Protein backbone atom coordinates (compact mmCIF):
# COMPACT_ATOMS: atom_id res chain seq x y z
CA UNK A 1 0.00 0.00 0.00
CA UNK A 2 2.88 2.38 0.71
CA UNK A 3 4.23 1.75 -2.79
CA UNK A 4 1.02 3.06 -4.38
CA UNK A 5 1.12 6.36 -2.48
CA UNK A 6 4.82 6.96 -2.99
CA UNK A 7 4.43 9.72 -5.61
CA UNK A 8 1.31 11.22 -4.05
CA UNK A 9 1.55 14.02 -1.50
CA UNK A 10 -1.38 14.74 0.78
CA UNK A 11 -1.86 17.83 2.90
CA UNK A 12 -3.94 17.99 6.06
CA UNK A 13 -5.00 21.56 5.37
CA UNK A 14 -5.54 22.95 1.87
CA UNK A 15 -2.73 25.09 0.54
CA UNK A 16 -3.42 28.81 0.41
CA UNK A 17 -2.95 29.97 -3.14
CA UNK A 18 -2.31 33.69 -3.38
CA UNK A 19 -4.63 35.17 -5.96
CA UNK A 20 -3.43 38.06 -8.03
CA UNK A 21 -5.17 41.34 -7.50
CA UNK A 22 -8.30 41.99 -9.53
CA UNK A 23 -7.71 43.40 -12.98
CA UNK A 24 -9.76 46.38 -14.02
CA UNK A 25 -10.44 48.26 -17.20
CA UNK A 26 -8.46 51.49 -16.97
CA UNK A 27 -10.79 53.13 -19.51
CA UNK A 28 -13.93 52.50 -17.48
CA UNK A 29 -12.22 53.51 -14.25
CA UNK A 30 -10.94 56.84 -15.56
CA UNK A 31 -13.90 57.55 -17.84
CA UNK A 32 -12.00 57.56 -21.15
CA UNK A 33 -14.39 57.23 -24.06
CA UNK A 34 -12.16 57.85 -27.07
CA UNK A 35 -8.81 56.17 -27.66
CA UNK A 36 -6.66 58.49 -29.73
CA UNK A 37 -4.67 56.70 -32.42
CA UNK A 38 -2.43 59.78 -32.78
CA UNK A 39 -0.95 59.25 -29.29
CA UNK A 40 1.69 56.53 -29.73
CA UNK A 41 3.10 56.87 -26.19
CA UNK A 42 -0.26 55.90 -24.70
CA UNK A 43 -0.72 53.04 -27.17
CA UNK A 44 2.72 51.62 -26.33
CA UNK A 45 1.31 50.60 -22.94
CA UNK A 46 -0.73 47.96 -24.77
CA UNK A 47 2.17 46.57 -26.82
CA UNK A 48 4.91 44.12 -25.86
CA UNK A 49 8.61 44.40 -26.73
CA UNK A 50 8.07 43.04 -30.23
CA UNK A 51 5.23 45.47 -30.96
CA UNK A 52 2.41 42.93 -30.63
CA UNK A 53 -0.87 43.93 -28.99
CA UNK A 54 -1.14 42.52 -25.47
CA UNK A 55 -4.19 40.32 -24.75
CA UNK A 56 -7.03 41.27 -22.41
CA UNK A 57 -6.04 38.70 -19.82
CA UNK A 58 -2.78 40.58 -19.28
CA UNK A 59 -3.95 44.20 -19.55
CA UNK A 60 -7.34 43.73 -17.86
CA UNK A 61 -9.08 45.82 -20.50
CA UNK A 62 -12.76 45.14 -21.20
CA UNK A 63 -13.76 43.62 -24.54
CA UNK A 64 -15.26 46.85 -25.84
CA UNK A 65 -12.13 48.88 -25.18
CA UNK A 66 -9.76 46.09 -26.24
CA UNK A 67 -11.35 46.26 -29.69
CA UNK A 68 -10.93 50.03 -29.71
CA UNK A 69 -7.29 49.75 -28.62
CA UNK A 70 -6.61 47.21 -31.36
CA UNK A 71 -8.23 49.46 -33.96
CA UNK A 72 -6.25 52.49 -32.73
CA UNK A 73 -2.98 50.54 -32.81
CA UNK A 74 -3.71 49.35 -36.35
CA UNK A 75 -4.46 52.91 -37.48
CA UNK A 76 -1.27 54.21 -35.84
CA UNK A 77 0.74 51.47 -37.55
CA UNK A 78 -0.79 52.37 -40.91
CA UNK A 79 0.23 56.02 -40.43
CA UNK A 80 3.75 54.92 -39.33
CA UNK A 81 3.29 56.29 -35.81
CA UNK A 82 3.94 52.80 -34.43
CA UNK A 83 6.09 50.06 -35.96
CA UNK A 84 4.53 46.81 -37.13
CA UNK A 85 7.40 44.73 -35.75
CA UNK A 86 10.45 45.69 -33.71
CA UNK A 87 13.05 44.41 -31.26
CA UNK A 88 13.13 45.82 -27.74
CA UNK A 89 10.55 48.54 -28.24
CA UNK A 90 10.30 49.45 -24.57
From Swiss-Prot:
Keyword Membrane: no
InterPro entries: Ribosomal_bS18, Ribosomal_bS18_CS, Ribosomal_bS18_sf
Top-level lineage group: Bacteria
Record keywords: Ribonucleoprotein, Ribosomal protein, RNA-binding, rRNA-binding
GO cellular component terms, A-Z: cytosolic small ribosomal subunit
GO molecular function: small ribosomal subunit rRNA binding; structural constituent of ribosome
Any one GO BP annotation for this protein: translation
SUPFAM superfamilies hit by this protein: Ribosomal protein S18
Function: Binds as a heterodimer with protein bS6 to the central domain of the 16S rRNA, where it helps stabilize the platform of the 30S subunit.
Record text on subunit structure and interactions: Part of the 30S ribosomal subunit. Forms a tight heterodimer with protein bS6.
Similarity annotation: Belongs to the bacterial ribosomal protein bS18 family.
Protein name: Small ribosomal subunit protein bS18
Gene name in the database record: rpsR
Amino acid sequence: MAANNQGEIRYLTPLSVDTKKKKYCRFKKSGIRYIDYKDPEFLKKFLNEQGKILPRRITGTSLKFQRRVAQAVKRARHLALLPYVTDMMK
